[in-house]
């Protein structure tokens, strides 16, 4: 571990990691009636709280409630949030839970019927409800085949666990848009790491074979029953009762209560009529449109690529202008793989979106100048911290990419960075380095909320 100057807070950070980046070759369970889904996504969870010296101050004994031998309690723990009462909410597999920091159970619930395979996102919204990223447990495709879908449903749940609404993305977006799916590196698709596929991409023929062979499950592909969307964050906008999703394999999308797309923050490539009109226009600080062709733009503006955590900065946004923080992982940047793997980089980005004019301005970024050492091919977080007016960035899988200096080495030594940057600056005031751990997310924990204010 290492730290740079600490001048903004005496912080504790919750860290949600894995010890190993390699997924098991054989899972204990898979769905078979119907097939598909991501039940086998049951990685080890390593959840703790560290201080700014990197010392462990709290650890979650997840085995008490998380049993890999039980399909109803297995799953990787993801989507941690600290609620206003100081407790923690998160989910794993077929469950979503709430506990305080002393381990007291507030609730531990099965997902509602018709939904399965929670992962990634648990948003406690301003309307008192929670939005969970799940999947459909029994969807009949247009070709008549029944499947579990994969990471493409958002369910809204009230305080008592009742279903209020859901957003079925295969009915809202185009599940056959394949541009990003074909361009991305198949060696690292979120937590599915397979170094034997490093640098490989999918072709249109590969995608067609999946349909011909009836191949479904947690595989990159197109169509319901495959990992065509990979939604990894959900955020509620109270000004218009809408949600903002980060779809790793499509882009960032705002969807209204009427299930209509409000806008899309992504490369215009591949969007058909009905969606193409919703793609935001990039502009400079004077509001002048920026020329973009073939998924590349003039100047410093860039879309986000295979991104995570598209979150509204509530205190700086209003009903017309929205500030959005994004962790731009950077795989498939420009809808292609670069000539050399060490040309890849990740970014933390803030976009300013004028929702009336349908424009987007990039107002802050960090990461391009850091280059490949900070490249995080999967996972990651960018989050605004209102109490300190800083940007929290977790370069969660730095070091995972290929190490060109070591011949034949496709997986490097992991060294995630927990960083905080003062608003508008690009030099971190906090920089904590972790070694030999596979990161998912990290964020500051407020002890006053947990033990004093409530």
What are these regions (language model features)?
Residues 3-8:
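Short, small-residue-biased leader/transition segments that mark boundaries at the very start
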Residues 18-36, 70-84, 120-127, 138, ...:
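Structural signature of eukaryotic scaffold interfaces centered on beta-propeller domains
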């Amino acid at each position: 571990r290492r730290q740079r100057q600490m001048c903004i807070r005496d912080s504790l950070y919750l860290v949600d990691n894995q010890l190993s980046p390699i997924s098991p070759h054989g899972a204990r369970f898979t769905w078979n009636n119907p097939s598909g889904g991501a039940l086998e996504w049951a990685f080890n969870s390593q959840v703790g709280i560290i201080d700014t010296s990197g010392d462990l101050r709290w650890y979650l004994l997840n085995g008490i409630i998380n049993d890999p031998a039980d399909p109803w309690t297995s799953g990787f723990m993801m989507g941690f949030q600290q609620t206003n009462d100081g407790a923690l909410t998160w989910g794993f597999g077929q469950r979503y839970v709430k506990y305080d920091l002393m381990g007291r159970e507030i609730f531990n619930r099965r997902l509602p019927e018709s939904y399965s395979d929670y992962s990634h996102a648990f948003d406690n919204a301003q309307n008192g409800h929670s939005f969970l990223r799940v999947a459909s447990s029994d969807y009949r495709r247009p070709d008549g085949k029944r499947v579990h879908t994969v990471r493409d449903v958002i369910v809204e749940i009230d305080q008592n666990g009742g279903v209020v609404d859901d957003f079925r993305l295969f009915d809202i977006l185009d599940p056959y848009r394949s541009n990003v799916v074909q361009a991305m590196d198949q060696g690292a698709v979120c937590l599915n790491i397979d170094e034997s596929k490093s640098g490989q991409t999918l072709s249109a023929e590969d995608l067609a074979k999946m349909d011909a062979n009836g191949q479904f499950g947690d595989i990159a592909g197109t169509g319901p029953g495959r990992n065509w969307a990979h939604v990894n964050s959900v955020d509620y906008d109270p000004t218009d009762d809408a949600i903002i999703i980060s779809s790793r394999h499509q882009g960032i999308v705002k969807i209204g209560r009427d299930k209509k797309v409000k806008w899309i923050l992504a490369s215009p490539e591949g969007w058909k009529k009905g969606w193409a009109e919703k793609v935001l226009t990039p502009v400079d600080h004077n509001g002048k449109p920026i020329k973009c062709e073939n998924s590349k733009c003039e100047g410093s503006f860039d879309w986000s690529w295979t991104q995570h955590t598209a979150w509204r900065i509530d205190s700086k946004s209003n009903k017309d202008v929205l500030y959005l923080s994004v962790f731009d992982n950077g795989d498939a940047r420009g809808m292609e793989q670069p000539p050399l793997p060490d040309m890849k980089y990740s970014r933390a980005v803030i976009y300013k979106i004028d929702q009336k004019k349908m424009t987007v301005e990039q107002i802050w970024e960090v990461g391009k100048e850091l280059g490949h050492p900070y490249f995080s091919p999967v996972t990651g977080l960018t989050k605004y911290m209102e109490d300190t007016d800083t940007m929290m960035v977790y370069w969660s899988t730095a070091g995972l990419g290929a190490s060109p200096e070591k011949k034949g080495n496709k997986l490097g030594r992991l060294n995630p960075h927990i960083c905080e940057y003062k608003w508008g600056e690009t030099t971190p005031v906090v920089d904590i380095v972790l070694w030999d751990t596979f990161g998912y997310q990290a964020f500051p924990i407020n002890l006053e909320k947990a033990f004093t204010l409530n």
